[in-house]
Amino acid sequence: FFGRVMDSTSLPVAIQNAPDYLGVGLSVKGLMDLQQRHPNFTLLKGEGPAGTMAEVIRSMQGKLSVFNGRGGLELTDNLRAGCVGMVPAPECVDRQIRIFELMEEGGTEAESEAERIYQEILPVIVFVMQSIEHFLCYGKRILAARLGLDVHDRLPSMTPTAFGLERVQ
């Protein structure tokens, strides 16, 4: 499927590879094969552990720019692994931007501050990343609470629990 899409254009192509969430995805070898056959495959949004992203980056030898998602889990380690950036969930975007800036700055003091900020937001990331449904239900509520917005669910959707709503606050 990806190859057919890539063959239909000369534009650079990005894909999202989320095997842990979708139950199907491309292995590191599969990504390498796809990129060799389709040089316009230039960007990957991975959805995996930082160690997996490091292996993808090493194996691709600079032929593929790699971002990771996963709501920002392992944010600092993903940047250390060579990800060019992250596409995290927006609940803590202001703090995630600061972490990225500090990691880009480099040095012991900047990285220590990045780790400190990451430790502050980690409970939020872990809370929302329990499942896709949980992420959609509670992630939007955390962001809305931070922005002072109302939440409007589209059905079908997970119904928040009283306990979950307490955690959002």
What are these model-derived regions, one by one?
Residues 1-4:
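Short, charged beta->alpha transition segments
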Residues 6-11, 19-132:
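Catalytic alpha/beta core domains of metabolic enzymes, predominantly
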Residues 25, 156-159:
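Generic, ordered loop/turn and secondary-structure boundary motif
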Residues 79, 122-157:
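Conserved short secondary-structure transition element at the edge of the structured enzyme core
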Residues 160-169:
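Long, low-complexity C-terminal extensions of enzymes
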